[in-house]
Amino acid sequence: MKKEKLLQLYKKYGLTQDDVFKHQHYVIITRTGIEKIEAKENIHIIYKSIKAETNFAVIKAIGTLDNRTMETFGSAMMQEYKQEIIKKKNVEGNLIDDIKQTRIGNCNTWYVCEMAEKRAFSRIVLKLTGFYALGVFGEDESEDFKKQ
């Protein structure tokens, strides 16, 4: 059922193999695919900046398709790495110092406001057209969703 519905939507919006790919856990639509969907449906979108700082931004997208209006958010935080020294046992059981590196943030570029807008755009288009209900995400929504 889900696969059939996705195929119907792909045909309806003229999506090709270049517009869609399978991620480890999800189906992903590329930026060009989302642009095709938005253009075909003529979705009206208004953006509002909720927060815009040097390293973090949140954009609200309010989208209208036919007589339905939805809103969603896109956010982006500049990616940083936090390092800390931790104690860990080596193979002999002795405590040694090790470095633990943690990734903080979800955007590897410095233009966080633009990335938040792209994410909000992807989400509102996919929500209004039924793709989100089928577990489909936009390529811009996560750095982990980039095509390999």
Segments from the language model and where they lie:
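Polyanion-binding surfaces on beta-sheet-dominated domains and ring/shell assemblies
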Residues: M1-Q148
